[in-house]
């Protein structure tokens, strides 16, 4: 599906800190989800500002390991339902009216998952089941219950720059004629 719903928002103030569940959050270009330590990490631009996981994937992993662990223990920022997260970098997701995220890569399950339940790391490994990492393209406010949808494929930053330069050059040439 190309449209879903945001079921959960979580953040953690520092590495290994407990996840804090939120009803709504501000999302910024500089810091991802405000108050989340990972979103504020540097790296121009930081490609893991926000992490997302599908409810169906988390439920499938739980069934595989025979446990029922709350989704936020995955340490993802956003839980989505009814949307197949894109498994390719560069795809953009709109949440609510304003926020746009760009998928940067798969979220690789770490050893912490194995500490939660034996076999969980392996259960989260196939087909991006562990979720997706994203960077913020456009900030704003999100809330549980917001729609989340895949945007039409946008050109990359370099493609936009080339298009703009071509347009500007042709516009300038036309103006001189």
Provide a role label for each language-model segment:
Residues 1-177:
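Metal-cofactor-dependent catalytic cores
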